[in-house]
Amino acid sequence: AVTILKAGLCPSGKMPVVIDNGFGGVIFHEACGHGLEASSVSKGLSVFSSKLGQKVASEFVTAIDDGTIPNAWGSLNVDDEGTKTQRNVLIENGILKSYLVDKLNGRRMNMASTGSSRRQNYRFAPTSRMTNTFIANGPHTRAEIIANTEYGLYAKSMGGGSVNPATGDFNFAVNEGYIIRNGQIAEPVRGATLIGNGPQILHQIDMVGENLARAQGMCGASSGSIPTDVGQPALRVKEITVGGAKGE
C-alpha cells in the first residue's frame, strides 16, 4: 500500500502486459469462461458458438475447468443435476475442445453433460456454470517472461472490473502495477486499467509461466451466487490497451 501511495501515474497506450499468477485468472473467468457455458453457446450468444475444434487462442493456452480438485473453493462431488463433476479441458494448446454443459442445454446441443450444472439453492433453476477454472502451466518462468519484455506493464495484483459477457469486452483495474524497462521491474505506477476483448486477448498470449496459483471468489449469474476458483500462472499479453491517468 505504501508503494502504491508513492507511485507515479501509469502511462496509457498499447503495450505488452505481464499479468501475475492467481487472481489474474479472473480476466479469463469473466471475459472467456462465461462464453464457454452451454447456456450462452446453445442460444448462439457466445463468440465461441460453433467453434469446437477451431483455434481460439495461442498455442501456449490450455484452459481447464475442474470441479474435482480436493478442497478447492469451487469443487463438488456431483453437480446440481446429479451428474458427477469432472476435469474438463476447454482449450488445449489453443484449440477449443469442450464447453461447460448442463443437461437442458446439452439436449439442445446434442452433447452430454460435463457435470457443470450449478445453482445457489433450491430457489434457482440450475444451469451451466464454472467450478475451478484456470489457465494451465506453460513452458516459461516468470523471470524469463520479465527478462524478455523490453518495455511494458507488470500487473502484480488485479482489482475489479466489468465485462460484456456477450462480446467478451472488458476493463479491469490494476491494483498494484510496475513499469517493465529493459527486462527488469522498475518504478511502481498507479491508475492503470486493462482494456480489451477476452477472445482476442487469448491469441495475444505469447508467454505462459509455470507458477500456477488459484484464488477464490463468488460468481453471480441467473442461477445465483456460487463459489468458484480462478487461476493462472504469470503470463504475457504481447499487446493490450492500458488506460492510465498519464497520457503518452
Where are the regions a protein language model picked out?
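N-terminal small-residue-enriched
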Residues: A1-E248
